[in-house]
């Protein structure tokens, strides 16, 4: 017997493909980071931790499954 989907909780965190506003670099980041995520090219802050969902300071291009 199959269990209904709502019985098994799904994670609310996702990986995101974001684009840096300063240099245009595309990078994959986690939606609930524990540390500040910086751009690999210019060093600008892309995501800041808040203890839960991070503050995203870049343009979200895609939500990855």
From Swiss-Prot:
Its cofactor is Zn(2+). One of its GO terms (cellular component) is ribonucleoprotein complex. SUPFAM superfamilies: Zn-binding ribosomal proteins. It comes from the Archaea. GO terms for biological process: translation. Pfam families: Ribosomal_S27e. GO terms for molecular function: structural constituent of ribosome; zinc ion binding. Zn(2+) binds at residues 20, 23, 39, 42. Binds 1 zinc ion per subunit. A zinc finger (C4-type) spans 20-42. Keywords: Metal-binding, Ribonucleoprotein, Ribosomal protein, Zinc, Zinc-finger. The keyword Metal-binding applies. Part of the 30S ribosomal subunit. Belongs to the eukaryotic ribosomal protein eS27 family. HAMAP family: Ribosomal_eS27. This is Small ribosomal subunit protein eS27. It comes from Pyrococcus abyssi (strain GE5 / Orsay). The gene is rps27e.
